[in-house]
From Swiss-Prot:
Origin: domain of life: Bacteria
Function, in words: One of the primary rRNA binding proteins, it binds directly near the 3'-end of the 23S rRNA, where it nucleates assembly of the 50S subunit.
Disordered as annotated region, ranges: 133-154
Family to which this protein belongs: Belongs to the universal ribosomal protein uL3 family.
UniProt entry keywords in alphabetical sequence: Ribonucleoprotein, Ribosomal protein, RNA-binding, rRNA-binding
GO MF annotation: an example: rRNA binding
Pfam families the UniProt entry points to: Ribosomal_L3
Gene Ontology terms: biological process: translation
GO CC, any one term: cytosolic large ribosomal subunit
Keyword presence, Transmembrane: no
Organism (species): Streptomyces avermitilis (strain ATCC 31267 / DSM 46492 / JCM 5070 / NBRC 14893 / NCIMB 12804 / NRRL 8165 / MA-4680)
The protein, known as: Large ribosomal subunit protein uL3
Self-association state and partner proteins as the record states: Part of the 50S ribosomal subunit. Forms a cluster with proteins L14 and L19.
Signal peptide: none
Length: 214
């Protein structure tokens, strides 16, 4: 059964620390949330499911193709750089062109934050998959950080799909779940979220109502 999901696109500004009411230091990530605009509303009657599409970020109109220009014109909004669709049971309550700001969330609520992790380049199995590696003594000959066996010679006689090996690390879509919104600065459009969120400073993040827990 679908539930009511709130969401907003924003930019990760970086981390800092603040003090709570008990005078304890709280590490927080500052996210400049929105403003977003609603560019499309999907309903059960027209699309078979309910969702709302929101847009964020400035873009030169000359860089927008004709189909997208028509899409934004239909919603009577200027072109935006990023689009995302959020499935929610109350999609019909949204209207085209409606603005969504940081006030969507309140302090104390649980959220999931999605972003693109920092790219680390080509990495070995110890860094990429937390392998233990081989022995550190002199008896191990130049194989200290190798993965070990990747499959038998005759049986199975091949390398299984999905076997963890060296390769490019990071630059992937990552979601951190059940983070707490510590504070909301509605005037500046900022969300202060406890803990770290994926991605570099300046990266795009999606803040949504937590799928699990509360």
């Amino acid at each position: 059964m679908a539930k009511q999901i709130k969401g907003i696109l924003g930019e990760k500004l970086g981390m800092t620390q603040v003090w709570d009411e008990n005078n304890r230091v709280v590490p927080v990530t500052v996210v400049k949330a929105g403003p977003n605009v609603v560019t499309q509303v999907r309903t059960n009657d027209s699309d078979g499911y309910e969702s709302v599409q929101i847009a964020f970020g400035e873009i030169d109109p000359r860089k927008v193709n004709k189909p997208l220009k028509g899409h934004f014109a239909k919603a009577d909004v200027t072109p935006r750089r990023h689009l995302v669709e959020i499935r929610t049971a109350d999609a019909s309550e949204y209207t085209l062109g409606q603005e969504i700001t940081a006030e969507t969330f309140e302090a104390g609520v649980k959220v999931d934050v999605t972003g693109k992790s920092k790219g680390k380049g080509f990495a070995g199995v110890m860094k990429r998959h937390n392998f233990k590696g081989l022995g550190a003594g002199h008896g191990t000959q130049r194989k200290h950080r190798s993965p070990g066996s990747i499959g038998g010679c005759a049986t199975p006689g091949r390398v299984f799909k999905g076997l963890r090996m060296a390769g490019r690390m990071g630059n992937e879509r990552v979601t951190t779940q059940n983070l707490t919104v510590h504070a909301v600065d509605a005037e500046k459009g900022l969300l202060l979220i406890k803990g770290a969120v994926p991605g570099p400073n300046g990266g795009l993040v999606l803040v949504r109502t937590a799928a699990k827990g509360a």
